Regions:
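Membrane-active amphipathic alpha-helices enriched in small hydrophobic residues
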Residues: 253-283, 287-288
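Intrinsically disordered, low-complexity charged segments of secreted bacterial virulence
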Residues: 1-264
């Protein structure tokens, strides 16, 4: 990661919710296109050499491109879902805010405090030695305190490094198969747009005249295999996120109820105070 990070669970959840909604819209917009291609391909009354060329073109080109877009959307969604869920293994608080600046500050503070404890322990030992001829006193043992502080310092260091490694891992994955699929899809679409295709004379296999189509098909197959192999994990991660959003909704409702109760109490207290003030003046006063 470049610069200092600040992990905010609420922001990541909001981003997940927004992108999930947007991608659901995209998928719903693609479905009529897929259905239209299927219907035209199965239309028995649409016959003839040119008609068969069009049907083959729709099946091999349009359906491949539509499927590629769907796979890219699903792969992106899955990758982010796994990325988001993985943070709960490091910190389970639904509303966690993790600034690297704070972690590094705690680490530095622990280092300083450990040094201070060592210095203080040495001063105490020296002072006791100065009166050893008068009274024998055992110097306090600072070992356990320093050991506990060292443990805190190490835990903070490890936690910070875990986040750095985790971000680097997912950045690498994002620049891997997902990026390759998107780049191949864009290159394939660009070549079709630039060179065009004679639909009425299209023959089966002509799609591979597009130099990027074989690579795109391979990336789609790889993505499909990944989604199949991780189907169970995807389902569990989706359930986890549903539980998170349900808990956040419950917490928000509870917070609103408590806020409303506080406002009612405050309003009631103000009303009582107002009544007492009016009674104290001897009667109700008209508001002009």
């Amino acid at each position: 990661m470049s610069g200092q990070y600040k992990i905010m669970y609420s922001s990541m959840d909001q981003f997940y919710d927004q992108t999930n909604g947007r991608m659901a819209e995209w998928v719903s917009q693609l479905e009529p296109w897929v259905k239209a291609c299927e219907n035209l391909g199965n239309m028995e009354c649409y016959q003839g050499k040119s008609a068969e060329s069009v049907k083959t073109y729709l099946k091999e080109v349009h359906m491949t491109l539509l499927t590629s877009i769907q796979q890219a959307i699903q792969l992106y969604r899955t990758k982010y879902l796994f990325y988001r869920e993985g943070y709960y293994d490091m910190e389970g608080d639904l509303y966690a805010v993790i600034p690297q600046k704070t972690l590094l500050s705690v680490k530095d503070r622990m280092k300083t405090e450990i040094e201070d404890v060592s210095d203080s322990s040495l001063i105490v030992q020296t002072s006791l030695l100065n009166v050893s001829d008068l009274i024998a006193l055992q110097a306090p043992n600072s070992y356990y305190l320093k050991d506990s502080m060292e443990e805190v310092k190490q835990n903070v260091t490890d936690f910070n490094q875990n986040i750095i490694d985790y971000e680097a891992q997912h950045k690498s994955e994002a620049n891997g198969e997902l990026a390759d699929l998107l780049q191949s899809l864009f290159a394939t679409l660009t070549e079709y747009y630039t060179n065009g295709t004679n639909v009425t004379s299209y023959q089966s296999g002509d799609c591979f005249g597009n130099s990027h189509m074989p690579e795109l098909c391979q990336h789609v197959l790889t993505a499909n295999e990944y989604l199949k192999e991780n189907a169970e994990e995807i389902e569990l991660a989706e359930v986890k996120m549903q539980e998170v959003f349900a808990q956040q909704y419950e917490d928000a409702c509870k917070a609103r109820e408590e806020e409303g109760a506080i406002k009612l109490l405050t309003g009631g207290a103000a009303a009582i105070t107002g009544i007492l003030a009016i009674v104290g003046t001897g009667g109700w006063q008209l508001r002009l």
